UniProtKB/Swiss-Prot annotation:
This is Protein phosphatase CheZ. Its EC number is 3.1.3.-. Disulfide bonds: none annotated. GO terms for cellular component: bacterial-type flagellum; cytosol; methyl accepting chemotaxis protein complex; plasma membrane. Belongs to the CheZ family. Plays an important role in bacterial chemotaxis signal transduction pathway by accelerating the dephosphorylation of phosphorylated CheY (CheY-P). The keyword Repeat does not apply. The gene is cheZ.
Length: 214
């Protein structure tokens, strides 16, 4: 015996499923819009690549500053080494002369070499000072990167605040797990969840998430 066709019923069921999916999708979309989450999601999607670019900028600026400082140190080192070597040599020669005075010709040569050393010192110190200035100027990246990092911290804190507000406003009461009694005294003052913007520290954030079961 042939089975009766159930095609109309199948078509009716499929239509109901599609209708329900569409209704649920619309409800979810409306709920997101009412909660402001649609904009929050869009902002988060934009914030992630922006944060990545900002971090890359900080890395670049830090690397450039480090390279400039290292180059200046390497350039200054030979000048410092040369002055140190010449000064030690002249000091030893003068010590020897005072211990056993030499003839006039040798003394004149010692004086001439000493005067030449003194004449060369300003050039070495001037070059070194220029390199020190370059090292100091290389540290200006801290102002720029500091502003970038501060901006990123502000964005992260705002996202955290918004997410906490969503949890506080929408998590079902029965899903909140009671805090363990042995931790209640260790966590200090509890967060007043009836007021907006009261979460002021990371410890309070952790306590709040723990009390909500996360």
């Amino acid at each position: 015996m042939m089975q009766p066709s159930i095609k109309p019923a199948d078509e009716h069921s499929a239509g109901d499923i599609i209708a329900r999916i569409g209704s649920l999708t619309r409800m979810l979309r409306d709920s997101l819009r009412e909660l402001g989450l649609d904009q929050a999601i869009a902002e988060a999607a934009e914030a992630i690549p922006d944060a990545r670019d900002r971090l890359y900028y900080v890395v670049q600026m830090t690397a450039q500053a480090a390279e400039r400082a290292l180059n200046s140190v390497e350039a200054s080192q030979p000048h410092q080494d040369q002055m140190e070597k010449s000064a030690k040599a002249l000091t030893q020669r003068w010590d020897d002369w005072f211990a056993d005075p030499i003839d006039l010709a040798d003394a004149r040569e010692l004086v001439t070499d000493t005067r030449q050393f003194l004449a060369d010192v300003p050039a070495h110190t001037s070059f070194t000072n220029a390199q020190l200035l370059e090292i100091m100027m290389a540290q200006d990246f801290q102002d720029l990167t500091g502003q970038v990092i501060k901006r990123m911290m502000d964005v992260i804190q705002e996202i955290e605040r918004q997410l906490l507000m969503v949890l506080l406003e929408n998590i079902p009461e029965q899903e909140s797990r009671p805090k363990r009694e042995n931790q209640s005294l260790l966590n200090g003052p509890q967060v007043d969840t009836s007021k907006a913007g009261v979460v002021a520290s990371q410890d309070q954030v952790d306590d709040l998430l723990d009390s909500l079961g996360f």
